């Protein structure tokens, strides 16, 4: 989040727990052979509104009982804990790196997937990366999110897929990324509780999906120690249910302040987008449209005592906050997240 709305809102929340990355730029391949990686534990507070997502990592994100399917969702508050990591081994002579772990792009989409893949330097042409994506801890959604007046049952949402990235294209700071994901909901019962719907109507609400996305971004310096990275993301979410099928268009802007010798650094991120759906929703009698936006900021501080973990670089603390919202033309699909988080970052 995909229901386009809830993915977009949850994206900012989990993105914040990680801290913003430099527009998802690939890390340079080390000059020496050996192991490298990072671990970034964090805890956070999340106030979240959704009628679609049940929980993540055992943390509840929406209420079991929905009293009126024509209303916007009530808010739910929860703590969150994350432990993103990455482990890599570099073969310096061939400019090849094998890696396994958490991809920040997937955590941004509230997916908690893992990736195993290879990164290859190709000289002046840039860096290529390919990876296989699979579910780590599947999110849980409601079997029938439209059930009224009774406790709803949840079900797992699993995913597999692949990602290709070409970064630093011809020595520039331009990056192209393509991702394919297949999403399966274990027990899909959307609309089963509504007796007036036909079997064809319920078919329109199914959420299993083949999703493709293309991300285009460019990173540049606009002043000393200040960097910007605009990005455009197009997503085609081909859901089994044509009322759930959608095309999404998002513009994202990332800002980074990083100064050598300064223990403080800052990252900020803002996005604005919309999603257009394919067919009329059989429950609400109109075709869904979403407008979504969000903003977040994270401050990092390198500890002055040189604390490290098993030979890592000096540990960094981070603290941040975020707000994100999806405003749908159907109130039931509205989404909102308010978040704060703290954590530490170790890199080898």
Segments from the language model and where they lie:
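Residues that define the transmembrane beta-barrel architecture of outer-membrane proteins
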Residues: 33-35, 77-83, 110-114, 156-162, ...
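Transmembrane beta-strands of outer-membrane beta-barrel pores
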Residues: 43-47, 91-93, 102-106, 132-138, ...
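Outer-membrane beta-barrel initiation region
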Residues: 24-95
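Short loop/turn motifs that connect adjacent beta-strands in outer-membrane beta-barrel proteins
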Residues: 24-35, 92-99, 121-129, 166-175, ...
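Membrane-embedded beta-strand positions of outer-membrane beta-barrel proteins
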Residues: 37-41, 98-100, 128-132, 174-178, ...
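Detector for outer-membrane/organellar transmembrane beta-barrel domains
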Residues: 174-177, 209-280
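Outer-membrane pore/translocation modules
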Residues: 61-65, 115-231, 236
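Outer-membrane beta-barrel "beta-signal"
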Residues: 299-301, 335-348
